[in-house]
């Protein structure tokens, strides 16, 4: 076998079906859309969730809950990520954004205990989980709530 003799295996490549190009093709005239009606027209078809005039499911089901306008969403940082920093570094929200660990501070930063920490760091954040606080202090570091 030579490079110029390479061919795709049989049935692995399918030519696209061009519709509306003559009746001999089997897909001419109506282009596989049948005769007239909403689905034969351009842009035709029903909107998402439409059930033919029957009351749709999303309207039959009762409303639930609400959006709390006072909700605070914290950017989450796990312990294993903090190992990137050198020993003795002061980890602040600004530093976390700068290094690309988090995209933005949101309502603050919460440190969670996923993974383990080997470095001695001073971590400044808005919230700490109890296990994360324990782990940072066990590694010889400090936690500071801001």
UniProtKB/Swiss-Prot annotation:
PROSITE patterns: RIBOSOMAL_L15. GO terms for biological process: translation. The keyword rRNA-binding applies. Residues 21-31 have a biased composition (Gly residues). InterPro entries: Ribosomal_uL15, Ribosomal_uL15/eL18, Ribosomal_uL15/eL18_sf, Ribosomal_uL15_bac-type, Ribosomal_uL15_CS. GO terms for molecular function: rRNA binding; structural constituent of ribosome. Residues 1-50 are annotated as: Disordered. One of its GO terms (cellular component) is cytosolic large ribosomal subunit. Pfam families: Ribosomal_L27A (PF00828). Residues 1-18 have a biased composition (Basic and acidic residues). Keywords: Ribonucleoprotein, Ribosomal protein, RNA-binding, rRNA-binding. HAMAP family: Ribosomal_uL15. Belongs to the universal ribosomal protein uL15 family. Binds to the 23S rRNA. NCBIfam families: rplO_bact. Part of the 50S ribosomal subunit. This is Large ribosomal subunit protein uL15.
């Amino acid at each position: 076998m030579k490079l110029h003799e390479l061919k795709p295996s049989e049935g692995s490549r399918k030519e696209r079906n061009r519709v509306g190009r003559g009746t001999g093709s089997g897909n001419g005239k109506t282009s596989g859309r049948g005769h007239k009606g909403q689905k034969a027209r351009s842009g035709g078809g029903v909107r998402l969730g439409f059930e033919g005039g029957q009351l749709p499911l999303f309207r039959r089901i009762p409303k639930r809950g609400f959006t709390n306008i006072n909700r605070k969403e914290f950017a989450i940082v796990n312990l294993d990520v903090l190992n990137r920093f050198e020993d003795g570094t002061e980890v602040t929200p600004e530093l976390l954004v700068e290094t690309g660990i988090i995209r933005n501070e949101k309502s603050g930063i919460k440190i969670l205990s996923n993974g383990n920490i080997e470095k001695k760091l001073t971590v400044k954040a808005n919230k700490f989980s109890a296990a994360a606080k324990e782990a940072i202090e066990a590694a010889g570091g400090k936690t500071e709530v801001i």
